[in-house]
Amino acid sequence: IAAIWAEILGVERVGLDDNFFELGGHSLLATRVISRVRQEQQLDASLKALFERPVLEAFAQGLERTTDAVSTIPLADRQQPLALSFAQERQWFLWQLEPESAAYHIPSALRLRGRLDVDALQRSFDSLVARHETLRTRFRLEGGRSYQQVQPAVSVSIEREQFGEEGLIERIQAIVVQPFDLERGPLLRVNLLQLAEDDHVLVLVQHHIVSDGWSMQVMVEELVQLYAGYSQGLDVVLPALPIQYADYALWQRSWMEAGEKERQLAYWTGLLGGEQPVLELPFDRPRPARQSHRGAQLGFELSRELVEAVRALAQREGTSSFMLLLASFQALLYRYSGQADIRVGVPIANRNRVETERLIGFFVNTQVLKR
């Protein structure tokens, strides 16, 4: 268990008295720890246990050997129609309603300074697309049901153009909002803006139906590894993926249809009730009847002293900084609305299986937290 902690936290070693959160742990890393402990050690572990007993010795002592073997995710028959995951079905439905919307585009812009080996970059993207089926998947409707089709691996189109600093942000935004065609694909767009001979901006855009924030991080990390090798004339072999996203989608459907769907529906209906309250904040203007997805962001920095104080308070209370800040946010909503029943949706990684850690795909889900 100490070795699992050390690997996931990125530290050399973990001692019996070490605290998971003091070593830099957070809820996403905690999820990976629990999945590893369950599947590799066959021990009954939970996120709640890790939060209640964050010190290694106490956490390990509270674990019990499970009699339920963790089943593996089987590989789907690629000769049969490949169903969508439940998350993909939501995205497919939303895209059919608003195919021109960019609300579910996932962008990333990387500044590349220094000499760029474009051939190595091309080879890196080609390797990524060959490695991850989601990067070459499109979607279709047949007989009233939706399916995903994995296409053969082909060379990625990298759109190259010369550009200057002036208007750069606007150009990137224009690239990001270009609509995707989920029926034709591809659902990964790559643009390379050359600002100077040794200065480029790499713009990556994916549709949410094949990706999420975790996936974008995986893609960038693997892109860096591949480019580092190819640019030096080396062959790069990344660890083999145990499954692909289509395998997960089929496994998820089988799992839910075996009784899990009814259990979860009963739980959430009992917790949230039938009617969901609408948060009525004192806006300057009336809420539109239809969401436009137009909005703005206000960024600001927290002082180092405040951040350290938040972390210290969270550790004393046996919680995470996220939970502490969420409680503060909900208190603020109560102050402005006067409503006692406030529900907040927060994204969860939803990758509680070891096989899914390095996959590019749409796993993230929104979980309702009730005050």
Regions picked out by a protein language model, each given a short descriptive name:
Residues 1-73, 143-153, 244:
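Phosphopantetheine-dependent thiolation modules in NRPS/PKS and related acyl-activating systems
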Residues 32, 36-39, 45, 76-152, ...:
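Acyl-group handoff/entry surfaces in thioester-processing enzymes
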Residues 105-109, 155-158, 295-297, 364-366:
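Short, solvent-exposed beta-strand edge segments and adjacent coil->beta transition regions
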Residues 107-113, 313, 368-371:
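Short, well-ordered beta-strand elements within core beta-sheets of diverse protein domains
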Residues 125-141, 279-282, 313-358:
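Hydrophobic "lid/gating" helix adjacent to the active-site nucleophile
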Residues 232-238, 256-258, 302, 308, ...:
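Acyl-thioester-dependent acyl-group transfer interface
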Residues 266-276, 315-316, 363-371:
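Helical lid/core segments from catalytic subdomains that handle acyl or acyl-like groups
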Residues 293-307:
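DNA breakage-rejoining catalytic core of tyrosine-based enzymes
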